[in-house]
Amino acid sequence: MSEHPLTLQSMIATILRFWSEQGCVIHQGYDLEVGAGTFNPATFLRALGPEPYKAAYVEPSRRPQDGRYGVHPNRLQNYHQLQVILKPVPENFLSLYTESLRAIGLDLRDHDIRFIHDDWENPTIGAWGLGWEVWLNGMEITQLTYFQAIGSKPLDTISGEITYGIERIAMYLQKKTSIYDVLWNDTLTYGQITQASEKAWSEYNFDYANTEMWFKHFEDFAEEALRTLKNGLSVPAYDFVIKASHAFNILDARGTISVTERTRYIARIRQLTRLVADSYVEWRASLNYPLLSLSSTSEPKETSESVVPMISSTEDLLLEIGSEELPATFVPIGIQQLESLARQVLTDHNIVYEGLEVLGSPRRLALLVKNVAPEVVQKAFEKKGPMLTSLFSPDGDVSPQGQQFFASQGVDISHYQDLSRHASLAIRTVNGSEYLFLLHPEIRLRTADILMQELPLLIQRMKFPKKMVWDNSGVEYARPIRWLVALYGEHILPITLGTIIASRNSFGHRQLDPRKISISSPQDYVETLRQACVVVSQKERRMIIEQGLRAHSSDTISAIPLPRLIEEATFLSEHPFVSCGQFSEQFCALPKELLIAEMVNHQKYFPTHETSSGAISNFFIVVCDNSPNDTIIEGNEKALTPRLTDGEFLFKQDLQTPLTTFIEKLKSVTYFEALGSLYDKVERLKAHQRVFSTFSSLAASEDLDIAIQYCKADLVSAVVNEFPELQGIMGEYYLKHANLPTASAVAVGEHLRHITMGQKLSTIGTLLSLLDRLDNLLACFILGLKPTSSHDPYALRRQSLEVLTLVSASRLPIDLASLLDRLADHFPSTIEEKVWDKSKTIHEILEFIWGRLKTFMGSLEFRKDEIAAVLIDSATKNPIEILDTAEALQLLKEEHTEKLAVITTTHNRLKKILSSLKLSMTSSPIEVLGDRESNFKQVLDAFPGFPKETSAHAFLEYFLSLADLSNDIQDFLNTVHIANDDGAIRNLRISLLLTAMDKFSLCHWESVAV
């Protein structure tokens, strides 16, 4: 970096000059309020259709909701984007971008440049693309995107967009911590020019904008866009769409558009942009696409090594797919896909090999196969065909069926005598009938030929969460493929994919060693890349990171264990370096969870905490992809400060907002459209509590009243709007700040956690969590939003397991069937003019929960037979009773095997007898009992009922008593003949057996493994 960094306007001039030299038209920013440079017609309209176009311009962008009254160091409602659009995308897209950074004085060897996954989309204009956020020492400075659709139209020709955050870059170059301190030119700062206006516009956008006027403007602009389109004027119509979009942004900032309405407004603007896009493409087509003559196409370049090699010995195989930076989450997916597909290809073609390994990093996926045989031998075999009589007529002519068969085999046969001319056909006699057999001789295929055909197909079959196209070849992959290495031993396999022919040339680390490198053989691959500063083994990179985290921890301060972040960091770097930075201690006063979210979600940093207290410390650990120096560390520290400042701003803003204001806002936030708002949900939870208190006295608590009242308040807070994963957690802080009961605050903080066994929750937190999940289950099942085998968008499976976990951990003795029946009364009986079936819905929910109960009991180490024995249709709907019954059965099996055998034997004997006998409808049981019947009835009458106390011990005692009863039953069965000729006596004895059988109804004893 030079001693005298560029002023903002000098930097802009330098970047524009760079792109002018690349052939870009230098536009001016558009003369309307746009939310981003993408809205400018030079991007939105020019990206449509097949015509090439290259442009660069500075776009003043208006985002009213991002205003911070001129006090935030780098968040503004009116800022600038330097936009570059390249259509079609050049092959050296990323290299051109990095060269533009060098032009403004950034020596990339001194910095940590990262390409972070960004699936960009703008729903308002129906635009989306795949690309990256570019981070400079932890600070996002640019967005790079390969557009895939604009105006909801898939693109004919892919455009590449570069959006420089020029204020942030200027802050970095000038070593400023606030945008307002940046030198605009040699005499004036950014703040002197814009800060007063920024404050004024924030006040207008948030506090004073005339919403009635802006609602009218929106309608007028939308109508004018439609009217203009009817006259075929797509360009003027688009201006009115831009105006409508800005009106919406003002209304959104004023908070006058609810969540439901917001979706509707966005959909309306998106519909308009689709109409504009269609109209614009039709208009350009009517002009015969005047710029199309400037386009060119790319074809694969033949090389001297484009001939398939002759391989005669066992050799190793290497396939490297070199691409622009893959998303960190895509690399492990690619590794799994490449390994699975490669094994499938090798197996399907009977290719012999000794071992297979797949390596992956951001810029490459590599397949290494050991000792691949040079040849595949397909052994000779015969295949039985049809009977000759079905193929030929008695005269020897081919029958219609024969014509069809021979055509399918590619054989020209018109008469029986023609068979002798074909060595691949033979006649065999099977069981006295003649059949035609197809003879397949031994075939030897070169492995190289198979790989030439299969490897390109393998790459195209790889599946990722999202794939893209980047040129006119139509090839799809997670990110643009820029090179292929395919070596069989020391020989090149010149496979072709799109415009690329494989070679032995790979590339080193983008910053540390960006040169082209030659791979001599698969055995040398890993070490050759290491010499070019690429650690291609993911296991080795992970080990480096884990060692670095330990090295930067101590007895007093250590990294907070975050396995997912370690995984992500492993696939964000090709040569990881671990270092440490710090931030101002003042931020440690913020909620710990907010600090962690800012560091992890936004910056990919590892937070640290004090080992003894668990309190967050002001040190963080960063994994770089370049050797850390003072510039890189200071840059990361400066990048974190604005993030924490923004978190602090949002948190303080929330603390200044009364909880009653949040509650009022819930009225405008839709829960489900058919079930009203989140406010309505809270009111329903209050009604649920009143019912629940009749099932458990614990629910009759003022602390629970307060927790329910405010449990959803933080959903409309500024912090949760930025970090949705902090909902509930922030609510706890806000309730404590409002001096509400600690028990209520803690419950709010607990109720949205993912709950697992062993996790401790407060009593109030347990009750609130349970009510919330039961309400969600009822709501979704009433609306028909039941999970499918592959789709569970509302996480109902998890919530059902959590219901069972909560009930089990707290031992709440509740009958879910009765409770759900009562809670269901708090929902409207008619949904969307249809009456929903209450009993059917509750049955479906119970069936769903019982399905999860099997999983839950399995996690508690109950055996399959024990689970099947207690989960019967007639079983109680009280999960605690079921779990206690299963535990008692488990104890019976382990400690009283003889008694268990008596029970099961007796049960099975009873069941067999009763299945063959029925009560006579013409005879009544006699009233005077014989001695044996009388004694047996006394035994049955004296037998204890089902346990009133819910505990495993009580159920075990019942089972032990049942074993004793079983002996009495056996004695009775051994001494009387049940099927007595006298119908009255037979009925009496059957009735006694039915009574006895009822004592066994707690379990399905046939399922128990004895």
Swiss-Prot record:
Pfam families tied to this protein: tRNA-synt_2e, tRNA_synt_2f
Glycine--tRNA ligase beta subunit, as annotated region: 313-1010
GO cellular component, as recorded: cytosol
Highest taxon of source: Bacteria
Protein name according to UniProt: Glycine--tRNA ligase
PANTHER family assigned to the protein according to its UniProt record, in alphabetical order: GLYCINE--TRNA LIGASE, CHLOROPLASTIC_MITOCHONDRIAL 2, GLYCYL-TRNA SYNTHETASE
Annotated segments matching region Glycine--tRNA ligase alpha subunit: 1-312
Enzyme category, top tier: ligase
EC number: 6.1.1.14
Family: Belongs to the class-II aminoacyl-tRNA synthetase family.
Annotated source species: Chlamydia pneumoniae
